[in-house]
Amino acid sequence: MSQFSFTKMHGLGNSYIYVNMFEEQIPEEDLALVAEKVSNINTGIGADGMILICPSDVAPVKMRMFNNDGSEGKSCGNGLRCVAKYAYEHKLVEDTVFTIETLAGIVTAEVTVEEGKVTLAKIDMGAPRLTRAEIPMLGEGETPFIRENFLYNNHRYAFTAVSMGNPHAVIFVDDVDQAPLTTLGPVLETHEMFPERVNVEFIEILNEEEMNFRVWERGSGVTQACGTGACAAVVASILNGKMERGKEITVHLAGGDLMIAWTEEGNVLMKGPAEVICRGVYEYKIEA
């Protein structure tokens, strides 16, 4: 029987099991199965996945993120805010501004601290990737994939594709609560045009500075929030002329609000909370 200490944290209800790999050890070959086991709501702790906080050669810390199906993702906005909170509060970093390595690249985090506790985290998510090759999508073309039609159940849905280090398909609807989240979501997620699968967001524009947001996450299904998805939604809204670049946009997710801005300089900034749920020790056994 093996075990490790964990901290369960969430960003707007998007929860992960966080493991400090400066102190703990999980064999590389076991990571996918452990992520699947620990995320199980019935036989594990229950979460949207597992995130490892690891040493890095190029930043103070490195984030590795696993979905609840065991697949490894390249980035996670809500996860990055929680990693930033954990790293500062556990003295893995000293400054309130620091970098985090991800599989999608290095991002910059800035934490707001009150009485020694991080109350808010802002992440510079870098520039969005907009071409088919960068997203990635099948097909040729170096222009952005904006408002292209997808036929489902005899209804045409127009979506815009954006990568924030992971792929997103953003669909505008009149009412997110009536959107085909659990039906169209998995169909588009696993469509052959996305070789690495895709996260699917449904967006309802409220005004020039606010939107409602629902998400079907690649490898996890319906979640309360998706930070990279919120960033992709704002980028897609600006590309479609629905919002203005440079302004801070309030994204209303099922789990709460994020503040997102696509700056004139090109990077996307995400600001929001990160909270600890519980801490403990998880025991597991890998069958031979």
Curated annotation (Swiss-Prot):
Function recorded in the entry: Catalyzes the stereoinversion of LL-2,6-diaminopimelate (L,L-DAP) to meso-diaminopimelate (meso-DAP), a precursor of L-lysine and an essential component of the bacterial peptidoglycan.
Keyword Cytoplasm: yes
Range of residues in the leader sequence: none
A Pfam family reported for this protein in Swiss-Prot or TrEMBL: DAP_epimerase
Pathway assignment: Amino-acid biosynthesis; L-lysine biosynthesis via DAP pathway; DL-2,6-diaminopimelate from LL-2,6-diaminopimelate: step 1/1
Protein name: Diaminopimelate epimerase
Subunit composition and interactions: Homodimer.
Catalytic activity annotation: (2S,6S)-2,6-diaminopimelate = meso-2,6-diaminopimelate
Keyword Transport: no
Major localization listed first in the record, in broad terms: cytoplasm
Chain positions of site Could be important to modulate the pK values of the two catalytic cysteine residues: 168, 217
Ranges annotated as spanning the membrane: none
PANTHER family documented for this protein: DIAMINOPIMELATE EPIMERASE, DIAMINOPIMELATE EPIMERASE, CHLOROPLASTIC
Active site: 76, 226
Domain of life: Bacteria
Organism for this UniProt entry: Bacillus cereus (strain ATCC 10987 / NRS 248)
MF terms (GO), sorted A to Z: diaminopimelate epimerase activity
Family: Belongs to the diaminopimelate epimerase family.
Positions with a binding annotation for substrate: 14, 67, 77-78, 166, 199, 217-218, 227-228
Gene Ontology annotations for the cellular component aspect, listed alphabetically: cytosol
Keyword set, alphabetical order: Amino-acid biosynthesis, Cytoplasm, Isomerase, Lysine biosynthesis
E.C. no: 5.1.1.7
